[in-house]
Curated annotation (Swiss-Prot):
tr-type G domain: residues covered: 14-196
Lineage: Bacteria, Pseudomonadati, Pseudomonadota, Gammaproteobacteria, Legionellales
Localisation: Cell inner membrane
UniProt entry tagged with the keyword Membrane: yes
Record key words, sorted: Cell inner membrane, Cell membrane, GTP-binding, Hydrolase, Membrane, Nucleotide-binding, Protein biosynthesis
Gene Ontology BP terms: positive regulation of translation
Protein name: Elongation factor 4
Enzyme Commission number, as recorded: 3.6.5.n1
UniProt-listed InterPro entries: EF-4, EFG_III/V, EFG_V-like, EFTu-like_2, G_TR_CS, LepA_C_sf, LepA_CTD, LepA_IV
One Pfam family, short name: GTP_EFTU_D2
Membrane topology: Peripheral membrane protein
Species, as recorded: Legionella pneumophila subsp. pneumophila (strain Philadelphia 1 / ATCC 33152 / DSM 7513)
Function: Required for accurate and efficient protein synthesis under certain stress conditions. May act as a fidelity factor of the translation reaction, by catalyzing a one-codon backward translocation of tRNAs on improperly translocated ribosomes. Back-translocation proceeds from a post-translocation (POST) complex to a pre-translocation (PRE) complex, thus giving elongation factor G a second chance to translocate the tRNAs correctly. Binds to ribosomes in a GTP-dependent manner.
Matching Gene3D superfamilies: 3.30.70.240, Elongation factor 4, C-terminal domain, Elongation Factor G (Translational Gtpase), domain 3, P-loop containing nucleotide triphosphate hydrolases, Translation factors
Name of the gene this protein is made from: lepA
């Protein structure tokens, strides 16, 4: 009786609902998903764990959703009919917005979950607009209604004023206790439109996500738009033209459940023994080899990395394992960009592109945990546009690739438009923070207790620790959403860090001339604390070109060579001290200083002292 005879073989598309949940971090999205799975009997009581869909350890520890997941559930509504609900989970953090747009492309509707105590947040707003742009039906839901500080009336007016959705009929629920969750499922069946599609048309399936399984090869999560795909069919990947035989199709309930076929309107997985990692790229279209579709489905926008950093294995023996790990991760995470890079200080590694600082942390943590690698990362940097004296335009994502100063005519830095939603009480500190970060105010709109402030801020100022500072000055109430706006001319310089008069290429940074002196001083001070003491003095210098702007010294450890002299002539002591001094000088010429990982990260964490 699997899925009630597959809902009469899914001939009735009117009984399928594909939806996502849109919510800010901590507004209860994963808990609501758990309740849906419980009510629809997807898992038994014993198999339930909190945040079922957050399958990675990192997701549970940090309490955030990183990867889009999918579950197919059977729900018997009050009208007596059984509906198939395909729920695609989405992340809430600003760094993972591309995951959200991918999930929404496979849906007809979305549930907007807003915390009844905290109200609307900037990232929720951004995702909600994406859903509305894609013509999805959005159902507002107020969560955490049982909290003593819940203010449903205020939040309803916020949803109407800020987002512009009619929220008078917003369903009030408590995902934790299960109160009102059935009403959400009923509203979902009643209001979200069924998928359009023709089971008899040639197959068109959109790849929403792919990941690598060491036994099965590439597993693709697909939304069937038209047609059907069965086990044993020969399918073709439309962008590459390669054909593969389908070994297995099925759905997640949330356990992987094999089926004979997937039909139009459904969301499920396909395994076709694809062993090469780029065999089924995300956003591509699958069709059948014998009866192919004419045109490719519109995919997703390719996301451009915003932040670049070098990642290097601590042991050079791990380089090949690191290359394989990156290839497998990039299949699962389409926004991860990487290319080989070598550094004099760190050896061979990769230059990787990320969507933001959280994305970078998560990728490094996943590489270290899932593939047992020890990695060193260099300070993150954004992409700068350089115009040379010859009139050429270059894009530079690595400070060590910057041409010599005489060859540079103009330098441009990327500017982002940041939309910050903040309660009125914290407006002052937020404006101060934005001005500190060289921000220019674009607009300010009051709605209820909240203020929406829009600033144009250099991206290099946003990607370091702007998000953390924003949260701390507003006690966690402010929320941020940003996107790239333009390149703008700026007075930028390359600052080198010298250790014992040797330039360390991996520590170079591009900074604004006005803040170069204070930044150089902070980096030198921080490095002084982090570099262990040696048998000789270690000089740490920050330099712009040949001009030294800051210096700190890590004092040498020294042995008391005069301890064995008891009395006697002072020249005896002096002779021993001179001998020690000469030895130290010789050691300094050949000595090699080990730089710990924390020192590399210090280059961009200097702001945290402010």
């Amino acid at each position: 009786m699997l899925f009630a005879r597959r809902l009469e073989q899914l001939k009735d598309l009117n009984r399928i609902r594909n939806f996502s949940i849109i919510a800010h971090i901590d507004h209860g999205k994963s808990t609501l998903a758990d309740r849906f799975i419980q009510i629809c009997g997807g898992l038994t009581e014993r198999e339930m764990s909190s945040q079922v869909l957050d399958s990675m350890d990192i997701e549970r520890e940090r309490g955030i959703t990183i990867k889009a997941q999918c579950v197919s559930l059977n729900y018997t509504a009050k009208d007596g009919k059984t509906y198939l609900l395909n729920f695609i989970d989405t992340p809430g953090h600003v760094d993972f917005s591309y995951e959200v747009s991918r999930s929404l492309a496979a849906c007809e509707g979305a549930i907007l979950v807003v915390d009844a105590a905290q109200g609307v947040e900037a990232q929720t707003l951004a995702v909600c607009y994406t859903a509305i742009d894609q013509s999805l039906t959005v159902l507002p839901v107020l969560n955490k209604i049982d909290l003593p500080q819940a203010e449903p009336e205020r939040v309803i007016s916020e949803i109407e004023d800020i987002i512009g959705l009619d929220a008078q009929d917003a369903i009030r629920v408590s995902a934790k206790s299960g109160l009102g969750v059935n009403d959400v499922l009923e509203a979902l069946v009643a209001n979200i439109p069924p998928p359009k599609g023709d089971v008899h048309a040639p197959l068109q399936a959109l790849i929403i996500d792919s990941w690598f399984d060491s036994y099965l090869g590439v597993v693709s999560l697909v939304r069937i738009v038209n047609g059907a795909i069965r086990k044993g069919d020969k399918m073709r990947v439309m962008s590459t033209g390669r054909a593969y035989e389908v070994d297995q199709v099925g759905i997640f309930t949330p356990k992987r459940t094999k089926l004979d076929a997937l039909y139009a309107g459904e969301v499920g997985y396909v395994v076709a023994g694809i062993k090469e990692i780029q065999g089924a790229p995300v956003g591509d279209t699958l069709t059948l080899d014998r009866n192919p579709a004419d045109k490719v489905l519109p995919g997703f926008q390719r996301v451009k990395p915003q932040v670049y950093a070098g990642l290097f294995p601590v042991s050079s023996d791990d380089f090949e394992a690191f290359r394989e790990a990156l290839a497998k991760l990039s299949l699962n995470d389409a926004s991860l960009f990487y290319e080989p890079e070598s550094s004099e200080a760190l050896g061979f590694g990769f230059r990787c592109g990320f969507l933001g600082m959280l994305h970078m942390e998560i990728i490094q943590e996943r590489l270290e945990r899932e593939y047992n690698l020890d990695l060193i990362s260099t300070a993150p940097t954004v992409v700068y546009q350089i115009v040379t004296q010859k009139g050429e335009t270059l894009l530079i994502d690595n400070p060590s690739h910057l041409p010599p100063t005489p060859q540079i005519k103009e330098m441009y830095e990327p500017i982002v438009r940041a939309n910050i939603l903040v309660p009125q009480d914290y407006l002052g500190p937020i404006i101060t923070l934005c001005v500190e970060r060289r921000g220019v105010q674009v607009s300010m709109t009051y709605s209820g207790r909240h203020v929406s402030v829009v600033y144009d801020i250099p991206m290099s100022e946003v990607v370091s620790d702007f998000f953390d500072r924003l949260k701390s000055v507003s006690r966690g109430y402010a929320s941020l959403d940003y996107n790239f706006q333009r390149f703008q001319i700026a007075d930028l310089v390359k600052m080198d860090i010298l250790i014992n008069s040797e330039r360390v290429d991996a520590l170079a940074v591009i900074v604004h001339r006005d803040s170069a002196h204070s930044r150089g001083k902070l980096i030198a001070e921080k490095m002084q604390q982090l570099i262990p003491r040696q048998m000789f003095d270690v000089a740490i210098q920050a330099a712009i070109g040949s001009h030294i702007i800051a210096r700190q010294t890590v004092k040498a450890l020294r042995k008391n060579v005069t301890a064995k002299c008891y009395g006697g002539d002072v020249t005896r002591k002096r002779k021993l001290l001179e001998k020690q001094k000469a030895g130290k000088k010789r050691m300094k010429q050949v000595g090699h200083v080990e730089i710990p990982q924390e020192a590399f990260m210090a280059v961009f964490q200097t702001d945290k002292k402010k």
